[in-house]
Amino acid sequence: MSARPDQSRTAAPSATTSPVEIYCDGACSGNPGPGGYGAILRYNGHEKEIRGSEAHTTNNRMELTAAMEALRLLTRPCRITIVTDSQYLVKGMTEWIQGWQRRGWQNSKKEPVLNRDLWEELLKLSAHHDVSWQWIRGHAGHAENERCDSLARQAITEMRGAP
């Protein structure tokens, strides 16, 4: 594994608006268990933070959900860079998904693809945009990634009703 961030693009229509930066992260307390996600969207000097949770989920589902919920907030086609510490998300969208689709949503071991519902939704949401997927190392001092992790954990705490 390289310490250099991976940068990959998914094919999408050309976008005509200013670039959007999305930082996202998912977290789980137990895996599976209660989970949360957090995301930061930046556009034209504006910033929006979002977070959410599910009572019983996995870390990977929260990673995918973070990206999905951020994409849902965009109202027109955009150039987007999505930055995440999830290789599962980046490789899924840039390397694996075409093969899964060709094989009828089976992985290379001929098993059903996990989280297919979320992958299909991510494909649908990203199809309207020009998306670049960037991996960064988690818990390595990247301010936005740390903030997204904090938002995800805060969402879990709020769901549990803790102060």
Curated annotation (Swiss-Prot):
Its cofactor is Mg(2+). GO terms for molecular function: magnesium ion binding; nucleic acid binding; RNA-DNA hybrid ribonuclease activity. Binds 1 Mg(2+) ion per subunit. May bind a second metal ion at a regulatory site, or after substrate binding. Residues 16-157 form the RNase H type-1 domain. Coiled coil: none annotated. The keyword Electron transport does not apply. Pfam families: RNase_H. It is an enzyme of class 3 (hydrolase). Keywords: Cytoplasm, Endonuclease, Hydrolase, Magnesium, Metal-binding, Nuclease. It is found in: Cytoplasm. Mg(2+) 2 binds at D25, D149. Mg(2+) 1 binds at D25, E63, D85. Its EC number is 3.1.26.4. GO terms for cellular component: cytoplasm. Endonuclease that specifically degrades the RNA of RNA-DNA hybrids. This is Ribonuclease H. It comes from Pelobacter propionicus (strain DSM 2379 / NBRC 103807 / OttBd1). The lineage of its organism: Bacteria, Pseudomonadati, Thermodesulfobacteriota, Desulfuromonadia, Desulfuromonadales. The gene is rnhA.
